[in-house]
Design a protein with these regions (language model features):
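Enzymes that bind and transform nitrogen-containing heteroaromatic metabolites
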Residues: 1-174
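Short beta-strand-to-coil "C-cap" segments at the C-terminal boundary of structured domains/repeats
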Residues: 167-172, 190, 217-221
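A short beta-strand micro-motif
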Residues: 174-180, 202
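Short acidic/polar mixed-charge low-complexity motifs
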Residues: 181-184, 207-209
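Short beta-strand-centered aromatic/proline hotspots
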Residues: 183-192
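Short aromatic-glycine-enriched beta-strand elements
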Residues: 196-201
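Intrinsically disordered, low-complexity, charged/polar segments
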Residues: 204-221
Length: 221
């Protein structure tokens, strides 16, 4: 089972305004839908405010984290269920052993809670290169996430601003990472200060060495 997160952010790191998306980007909504439905038996995880904003999303199991909402039912063969905590949710998922991918879709407190528990393997970020008026912002990614890939859409938001689809991957202990074409990309501007001692092996210019995230400084943009 994979635990991933997906979010769209603006140039000023905003993700919401008045509990809604501050922009309309059909391309990104299709991207979100295709990923979260995907193949297999997938579920989305959201907080109460996100649930109030987007409602129940079809063709996926919907899990809502809330201390005040309490319901559980099946709709079109998909489970709609609330949980009071991440621990309760994970216990249920582990006991059922019935899910291929879990997708965390917001809001900001939910992202941060899962990051603090080191539960997110892949983080899918749609970056819209434009400033928006926002009242909710994305929390910082820990510095032990490496950029796995970045694709720039051939289309422009408002015919002016670029749309970037970026995937970050969490470094695991003793992980071997191979960098091709002498290119290594690190998260530099968005990070937490409390970095864990995660040792892993890197291969760079056909040479291997063991390092940890504190001393990984051979990066290029």
């Amino acid at each position: 089972m994979n635990i991933n997160a997906i979010v769209a952010i603006s140039k000023n790191n905003g993700i919401g305004l008045n509990n809604k998306l501050p922009w309309k980007c059909k391309e990104d909504l299709i991207y979100f839908k295709n990923l979260t439905i995907g193949k297999g038996n997938n579920a989305i995880i959201m907080g109460k405010n996100t649930y109030k904003s987007v409602g129940i999303l079809p063709k996926r199991h919907n899990f809502i984290l809330s201390s005040t909402l309490h319901f559980s039912y099946v709709k079109n063969n998909f489970l709609i269920k609330t949980f009071i905590s991440i621990d309760e949710l994970l216990k249920f998922i582990n006991n059922t052993n019935n899910y291929d991918n879990l997708w965390i879709i917001g809001g900001s407190k939910i992202y941060k809670s899962f990051l603090n528990k080191h539960l997110i393997d892949l983080f899918y970020i749609t970056y819209i290169d434009k400033y928006f008026d926002c009242d909710t912002f994305m929390c910082k990614l820990p510095n032990y996430y490496l950029k796995l890939s970045e694709k720039i859409s051939p289309n422009k938001f408002d015919d002016k601003h670029s749309i970037h689809y970026i995937i970050f991957k969490k470094i695991h202990k003793n992980m071997k990472i191979i960098y091709k074409n002498n290119h290594i990309s690190m998260v530099k501007d968005i990070h937490f200060d409390n970095l864990p001692d995660i040792y892993f092996t890197i291969e760079y210019d056909n040479k291997e060495c063991q390092t940890d995230i504190h001393h990984l400084s051979i990066y290029k943009n």
